[in-house]
Amino acid sequence: ECMSIWSRFIGTRKSEETNNVIGNQIHMCHMMPSRYAIVDVEIGLKDHKIHDIGALRHDGATFHKSSKEELFKFLGDINYVCGHNIIHHDARYLFTDEACRWLLVDTLYISPLLFPERPYHKLVKDDKLISEQMNNPVNDCEKAKDLLLDEITRWNLLPNEKRRLFASLLKDKKEFEGFFSMVGAEYINEGVSELIRNLYVGKICQHADLDMLVRQHPCELAYALALIATTDYRSITPGWVLHNYPGVEFVIKLLRHASCNEGCVYCNSQLDVLHNLKAFFGYGRFRTYEGEPLQEQAAQAAVKG
């Protein structure tokens, strides 16, 4: 696999509260990355070898051959090599003999964070790019570029605190670090749990063990929080995310479906059975059977799992 070169490109500019992920050799443009290329590799299903390579450079130049060596010459002195699932697919075949000189930007993993709501992103279905032409890597590069620029635009539309939260959770993960470098993301090393509580008041249990989740399940937590912030109740976590990060469901259960004993804004409203009986059905109390509140007990048991 391609070696991480995070330390080669990335420095941290410290302020009183935040660190800024910046490129030491790059002047960041928050609306449009400067020196980058999109790469797509076609692999044979039987021989697992490279059959075709497409690339699209920031200056509009294209590449369409099957030679890795010629591709590397085409890439030249760019800073970022981008692609859809490039970390765990294309890079595995491109950088088998030598270390990767470029910082990798993967459009796949950041997409569910930035487009968590139905109908998600128009160019992505499951974990694949939607393309009009089969087996045309240059066309796939054009689609990946469109997706990347949409992701950068959406990132810059997020509130500052939401951007800081995602970057703080995921800054050390190779699937995200290239994108965060490209957009000049800021992050904090401490106080992430408190930031989550402030951003998600009334949306999650305020007594959930966020410190543990930040420490042990940062990716799953980020995807869960992105989904929780949606307004369309039909929105779901993509299947490929659950396959790679099965802990997402555990995190959502901990944040949203485990009523705390202390009581908080979320649990007192969303997980209180009497409150919801009144809100949804207009009744102030459950029926009893021979003096026993069996309906209420069943509802409480369902809430507690």
Where do the protein language model's features map onto the residues?
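Conserved pre-motif I regulatory segment
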Residues: V273-G305
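Acidic, Mg2+-coordinating catalytic module of metal-dependent nucleases/exonucleases
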Residues: L123-R215, C219, A224-L225
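Repetitive beta-architecture junctions, highlighting loop-to-beta-strand starts
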Residues: S34, I50-H51
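Interdomain "pre-motor" coupling segment immediately N-terminal to P-loop NTPase/helicase cores
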Residues: C219-G282
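Two-metal-ion RNase H-like nuclease active-site motif
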Residues: S34-G44
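N-terminal accessory regions of nucleic-acid-interacting proteins
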Residues: S4-S34, D106
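Conserved DEDDh/DEDDy metal-dependent 3′-5′ exonuclease domain
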Residues: D47, G54-W155
